[in-house]
Amino acid sequence: MKLIDSGLSGYEDMLDRQLEIFERIKEGSGDDTLIVTRHRPVITLGKSARIDDLLFPLDIIEEKGVSVRKVGRGGGTTYHGPGQLVLYPICDLRNFDKDLRTFIRNLEKVMKKTANCFDLSTKILDE
Protein backbone atom coordinates (compact mmCIF):
# COMPACT_ATOMS: atom_id res chain seq x y z
CA MET A 1 0.00 0.00 0.00
CA LYS A 2 1.33 3.43 -0.94
CA LEU A 3 1.45 6.04 1.85
CA ILE A 4 1.01 9.76 1.15
CA ASP A 5 1.60 12.25 3.97
CA SER A 6 0.13 15.47 2.63
CA GLY A 7 0.52 17.62 5.75
CA LEU A 8 -2.01 20.45 6.12
CA SER A 9 -4.42 20.53 3.18
CA GLY A 10 -7.59 22.11 1.93
CA TYR A 11 -10.60 19.79 1.91
CA GLU A 12 -11.41 20.29 -1.78
CA ASP A 13 -7.79 19.75 -2.86
CA MET A 14 -7.67 16.51 -0.89
CA LEU A 15 -11.01 15.36 -2.31
CA ASP A 16 -9.70 15.98 -5.85
CA ARG A 17 -6.56 14.00 -5.05
CA GLN A 18 -8.63 11.10 -3.68
CA LEU A 19 -10.75 11.03 -6.84
CA GLU A 20 -7.63 10.99 -9.05
CA ILE A 21 -6.19 8.05 -7.11
CA PHE A 22 -9.55 6.26 -7.18
CA GLU A 23 -9.76 6.62 -10.98
CA ARG A 24 -6.23 5.22 -11.43
CA ILE A 25 -7.03 2.25 -9.19
CA LYS A 26 -10.29 1.67 -11.06
CA GLU A 27 -8.40 1.69 -14.38
CA GLY A 28 -5.86 -0.78 -12.99
CA SER A 29 -2.94 1.64 -13.12
CA GLY A 30 -2.88 2.79 -9.49
CA ASP A 31 -1.84 1.36 -6.15
CA ASP A 32 -3.95 1.00 -3.02
CA THR A 33 -3.17 4.19 -1.12
CA LEU A 34 -3.45 5.60 2.37
CA ILE A 35 -3.47 9.39 2.56
CA VAL A 36 -2.58 10.98 5.90
CA THR A 37 -3.53 14.64 6.23
CA ARG A 38 -4.78 17.43 8.44
CA HIS A 39 -7.38 19.82 7.07
CA ARG A 40 -7.76 23.54 7.28
CA PRO A 41 -10.96 24.21 9.31
CA VAL A 42 -13.97 22.76 7.50
CA ILE A 43 -17.36 21.33 8.37
CA THR A 44 -18.61 18.73 5.92
CA LEU A 45 -22.27 17.90 5.55
CA GLY A 46 -22.93 14.31 4.47
CA LYS A 47 -26.03 13.11 2.66
CA SER A 48 -28.18 13.00 5.79
CA ALA A 49 -27.02 16.40 7.12
CA ARG A 50 -28.80 19.70 6.67
CA ILE A 51 -27.50 23.23 6.98
CA ASP A 52 -29.99 23.62 9.85
CA ASP A 53 -27.95 21.01 11.79
CA LEU A 54 -25.21 23.59 12.36
CA LEU A 55 -25.13 24.97 15.90
CA PHE A 56 -24.36 28.51 14.71
CA PRO A 57 -25.51 30.52 11.68
CA LEU A 58 -23.47 29.86 8.54
CA ASP A 59 -22.21 33.46 8.28
CA ILE A 60 -20.80 33.33 11.83
CA ILE A 61 -19.06 30.00 11.15
CA GLU A 62 -17.49 31.29 7.92
CA GLU A 63 -16.55 34.57 9.65
CA LYS A 64 -14.46 32.45 12.04
CA GLY A 65 -12.55 30.99 9.07
CA VAL A 66 -14.36 27.65 8.91
CA SER A 67 -15.59 26.48 5.50
CA VAL A 68 -18.84 24.54 5.23
CA ARG A 69 -19.19 22.04 2.37
CA LYS A 70 -21.94 19.67 1.25
CA VAL A 71 -20.24 16.40 0.29
CA GLY A 72 -21.28 13.15 -1.37
CA ARG A 73 -20.41 10.82 1.50
CA GLY A 74 -22.98 9.26 3.76
CA GLY A 75 -23.59 10.40 7.29
CA GLY A 76 -24.10 13.68 9.05
CA THR A 77 -22.00 16.67 10.02
CA THR A 78 -18.24 16.37 10.63
CA TYR A 79 -15.64 18.96 11.64
CA HIS A 80 -12.03 18.65 10.45
CA GLY A 81 -9.27 21.02 11.49
CA PRO A 82 -5.56 21.51 12.17
CA GLY A 83 -4.17 19.07 14.72
CA GLN A 84 -6.75 16.43 13.81
CA LEU A 85 -5.21 13.58 11.86
CA VAL A 86 -7.39 12.26 9.02
CA LEU A 87 -6.71 9.02 7.17
CA TYR A 88 -8.17 8.28 3.75
CA PRO A 89 -7.75 4.67 2.58
CA ILE A 90 -8.34 4.34 -1.16
CA CYS A 91 -8.32 0.66 -2.00
CA ASP A 92 -9.55 -1.91 -4.46
CA LEU A 93 -11.66 -3.98 -2.07
CA ARG A 94 -11.09 -7.03 -4.25
CA ASN A 95 -7.60 -7.05 -2.69
CA PHE A 96 -9.07 -7.08 0.83
CA ASP A 97 -12.43 -8.02 2.28
CA LYS A 98 -15.09 -7.82 -0.40
CA ASP A 99 -17.63 -6.73 2.21
CA LEU A 100 -17.32 -2.97 2.76
CA ARG A 101 -18.70 -3.19 6.30
CA THR A 102 -16.07 -5.79 7.29
CA PHE A 103 -13.32 -3.67 5.72
CA ILE A 104 -14.43 -0.59 7.67
CA ARG A 105 -14.72 -2.54 10.95
CA ASN A 106 -11.18 -3.87 10.45
CA LEU A 107 -9.89 -0.32 9.88
CA GLU A 108 -11.64 0.83 13.05
CA LYS A 109 -10.03 -1.98 15.05
CA VAL A 110 -6.56 -1.08 13.76
CA MET A 111 -7.09 2.59 14.63
CA LYS A 112 -8.36 1.67 18.10
CA LYS A 113 -5.32 -0.52 18.78
CA THR A 114 -3.01 2.22 17.52
CA ALA A 115 -4.67 4.85 19.75
CA ASN A 116 -4.48 2.52 22.75
CA CYS A 117 -0.70 2.25 22.23
CA PHE A 118 -0.59 5.98 22.98
CA ASP A 119 -2.88 5.64 26.02
CA LEU A 120 -5.73 7.30 24.14
CA SER A 121 -9.18 6.01 24.95
CA THR A 122 -11.42 5.20 22.02
CA LYS A 123 -14.91 4.00 21.33
CA ILE A 124 -16.20 2.37 18.19
CA LEU A 125 -19.89 3.10 17.67
CA ASP A 126 -22.14 0.04 17.42
CA GLU A 127 -19.51 -2.02 19.24
Regions found by a protein language model. Name each.
Residues 1-126:
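N-terminal lobe of the biotin/lipoate ligase/transferase fold
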